[in-house]
Swiss-Prot record:
Glycosylation sites (chain numbering): 11
Upper lineage: Eukaryota, Fungi, Dikarya, Ascomycota, Pezizomycotina
GO biological process per UniProt: vesicle-mediated transport
Entry keyword Transcription regulation: no
Protein name: Golgi apparatus membrane protein tvp18
Native organism: Neosartorya fischeri (strain ATCC 1020 / DSM 3700 / CBS 544.65 / FGSC A1164 / JCM 1740 / NRRL 181 / WB 181) (Aspergillus fischerianus)
Superkingdom of this protein's organism: Eukaryota
Entry coiled-coil feature ranges: none
Amino acid sequence: MTLAEEFRSRNFSIYGQWTGVLCIILCIALGIANIFSFAVLRIIFSVLCLYAMSGLILIFIEVPFLLRICPTSSKFDAFIRRFTTNWMRAAMYAIMSVVQWLSLLPGSGASSLIVAAVFLLIASIFYALAGLKSQEFVGSKTLGGQGLVQMIV
């Protein structure tokens, strides 16, 4: 399946996965941009956006090919493999979005981390729609889904 065929399939998990890739880029970029701030709360939320929750964890969840080529522990692999259903991914993205929405707390002030919160929420909605429509989770072959992983093994 080509990328265009994947988008025409109307499977919301594909939309969620590609929105997740956009979230990876946004979380890493905005996490780095907001870490250079004088507001302590904003620094904490930018670290959460960059390292602890969003950016680096999402890379391994949304690009399964990386689990094959990067040396990771078995505990980390087991943690990542928990997010194989649409509902688990929707819940994960919703939690990450709520954490970034909390960056609006009065001590932090408004920042560009809101963009990450919005896109994490959109990805959560896509995965929830896939779950509501009882669509199977389908990983994009471009990102290392079924086709690419089989070629490497």
